[in-house]
């Protein structure tokens, strides 16, 4: 059997293979509520054979949405439709996961197909918050620097969102601390210029993420895993670095984090990112090698043999696929056939199974 299709157990949750649906924003919600689009989008990837389906960045507070069209989990009223999604995913033999997020200074923007520009409060947007009053790009409105009460609210919002996620049936929680959103903004000295207990030193800049992890882990049953997505580097001198990520991974491991989802960038506009096939795998490999903590590799993983090589050579424990699963929701089934592994197909689709000659 191909390494890509061996099971992986994280705490009390076993993934049937090493293919994970990476969280991908659909910008298709209204007031945070999921709808049929999200059910079909996530459900079809579960039908397609992925082991873990992680729902897109789901806002822990309304002001934490990237766009007015983001999913949310800040009120109990969001839960009934989310339960439909998790039940369907589980019925296909996959594990439902959710990425909890706060967009920080990158909140209150339009969706990509609407131009991605900021939405003013008069147009349905809202004031944004960040560690420091520094806009992501100079042309945008500067965010408000969070005070202690605001920081305490962020921590409480993540914990409350975790409780709701459990009530909705999610079995894996991922904290979004990457891509220039709030928790990443606190990590990087390029966006965090505070002089209090949350700025300056490595320990201070990582304090908020540590407190969020502790709050979420306290809410989670011991048998359920906790993931953290990190941008392993800002790709800019003076920013968050790969060395920082290794050091932070060791800290997070001690706080009960079970896997680091290794992405990069997003905190510096026009950063010189060397985008190419598997360009972020090296960061997953390094964190795994130097800490012993399981990792996930993500970013332009588009080929069955490429994914197999990543897992087989111990560079990462799982691969997270995004664009490739938009192109082919049934990539896991097709990859298994290509790699010579026989997987059960949904009985409704059995007539479409490729036959070996």
Predicted regions and their residues:
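Flavin-dependent oxidoreductase catalytic cores
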Residues: 1-357
